[in-house]
Amino acid sequence: MAETDSFLHLARPLGPVAVGSAPTTAPLNVVIQPQAIFSILDHSLRRNADQERVIGTLLGTRSEDGTEVEIRSTFAVGHTETTDQVEVDMEYQKQMLALHLKANPKEVLVGWYATSSELNTFSALIQNFYSGQGDGTWPHPAVHLTVSTEPGKDIETRAYISAPVGVTAERAADSAAFIPVPYEIRYGEAEKSGLEAIASAKDAESRATNIFTDIEALERAIEEVLGMIDRVSRYVESVIDEEAPASTALGQFLLNALALAPKVEPADIERDFNNHIQDVLVVSYLANTIRTQMELSNRLATAQLTLGGEGASAEAGAQRGQRGGKGGRGGQQRTQERASEEVRA
């Protein structure tokens, strides 16, 4: 990912525009979530071969004062672009926007993206649509995010807002001055671990990687921290020995990093760590004990049901045998009575 640039943002009117119809151009900071970048890259990979760029809608949140926009999700919008005209499926965009806002009521429309760094007249037309009243972001500015997706090159990202410009009101409808604004790609620890796992597969022939367990991930993180500490130690030693030039900014950064470390004695850290390990072992032992008791209870219940079923079957068979024996004795008595009657006759 390309490094971010520094901007000096001056808000000023750039052209004639009706009062109350122009979005504000106050200083703005844009925060981009990694999943939004991945969604844009996936859309770029699925584009038609004859398309130079694809566009889509940006969704996210906006701070209460409107000075910070966080881009969280995106969706693609179909469009056809030639040298003379551009056609955008605005009806599809409106329906998809309503669906996304219904599923995620905390998100709002914040702008649009394009997979090309070029800014032209068509970009101004689309920008004016997204920043307009009604279905646009008005009175807030619409963010235009450009993501360069040229094969073999680094992914370059730029963020812009626009101000109206034009000699007449008619020309202002298809014109806009794009103003670059600072942006930041922000991710948490879980997202960072996922990105590192994905990046580890880029050098493999199979383009696949294994997901580490918690213990393996902890071991890997500790090894990385130890490696960084060794690298910093070597740099400090080289500066002390006047083998490398000193950097005031780097020294201040290291000083601030050391100030964040808790001032605890190593013996206290070791004692707390051992206590934590013992607590974890106790919890694990109790969990295994409960699991074993549950398995024994299930097996005992199953055994009782099995034994109870077999005993009931044997008892029912004995009762049927007794009833059969009684029936046989009754038949013998009736046969003897008939024989006695025949003899008397």
UniProtKB/Swiss-Prot annotation:
Q: What is this protein called?
A: Eukaryotic translation initiation factor 3 subunit F
Locate the transmembrane regions by residue number: none
Similarity comment text for this entry: Belongs to the eIF-3 subunit F family.
Q: Where is the composition biased (Basic and acidic residues)?
A: 335-345
Q: Which CDD domains match?
A: MPN_eIF3f (cd08064)
Task of the protein: Component of the eukaryotic translation initiation factor 3 (eIF-3) complex, which is involved in protein synthesis of a specialized repertoire of mRNAs and, together with other initiation factors, stimulates binding of mRNA and methionyl-tRNAi to the 40S ribosome. The eIF-3 complex specifically targets and initiates translation of a subset of mRNAs involved in cell proliferation.
**InterPro entries this protein is in?**
eIF3f, EIF3F/CSN6-like_C, JAMM/MPN+_dom, MPN
Gene Ontology BP terms: formation of cytoplasmic translation initiation complex; translational initiation
Segments carrying the region annotation (Disordered) are: 310-345
Q: Where is the composition biased (Low complexity)?
A: 312-321
Supply one GO molecular-function term.
metallopeptidase activity
User: What is the originating organism of this protein?
Assistant: Aspergillus fumigatus (strain ATCC MYA-4609 / CBS 101355 / FGSC A1100 / Af293)
Q: Where in the cell is it found?
A: Cytoplasm
